């Protein structure tokens, strides 16, 4: 093998390794059996959510994962493999892939990485049930507002009760 080919492969592995480093989550799937239309629809939905899906050689994936300390993923890099990387929303790849896996039996989630930790299939499926970032932020805002809202209602009720009392 020529030095040029080896250098090119090393550059590909380095690029994948950088994607693993910068990703908040990555989901590894087996896509064998999906039609072109299904893969196109999946890629479109992932892209709209800010997720990048790539079909990569298992050897490159294994080397890049090992370089980042994700040796536990070596077993999932077998057969046709695609990886969905997200740099922003750690839930998006899991949620979208789980949705498509439910719709199409051909798509199988193998494993992944969440917040720089290797995640099992069960963990990814649990993550897929969580709301997206905006949903989580709105839930947090609601929880933070509840005590203030309740206090305001109590103050209003006390004020109304004082207004209704006859003057003595």
Swiss-Prot record:
Give the CC-aspect GO terms: large ribosomal subunit
Family annotation (InterPro entries): Ribosomal_uL10, Ribosomal_uL10-like_sf, Ribosomal_uL10_bac, Ribosomal_uL10_bac_type, Ribosomal_uL10_CS_bac
Q: What Gene Ontology terms for biological process does this UniProt record contain?
A: translation
PROSITE patterns assigned: RIBOSOMAL_L10
Question: What CDD domains does the record point to?
Answer: Ribosomal_L10 (cd05797)
Q: Could you tell me which HAMAP family the record lists for this protein? A: Ribosomal_uL10 (MF_00362)
Q: How does it assemble?
A: Part of the ribosomal stalk of the 50S ribosomal subunit. The N-terminus interacts with L11 and the large rRNA to form the base of the stalk. The C-terminus forms an elongated spine to which L12 dimers bind in a sequential fashion forming a multimeric L10(L12)X complex.
Role: Forms part of the ribosomal stalk, playing a central role in the interaction of the ribosome with GTP-bound translation factors.
* PANTHER family associated with the record: 39S RIBOSOMAL PROTEIN L10, MITOCHONDRIAL (PTHR11560)
Q: Which family does it belong to?
A: Belongs to the universal ribosomal protein uL10 family.
Q: Output this protein's name.
A: Large ribosomal subunit protein uL10
Origin species: Lacticaseibacillus paracasei (strain ATCC 334 / BCRC 17002 / CCUG 31169 / CIP 107868 / KCTC 3260 / NRRL B-441) (Lactobacillus paracasei)
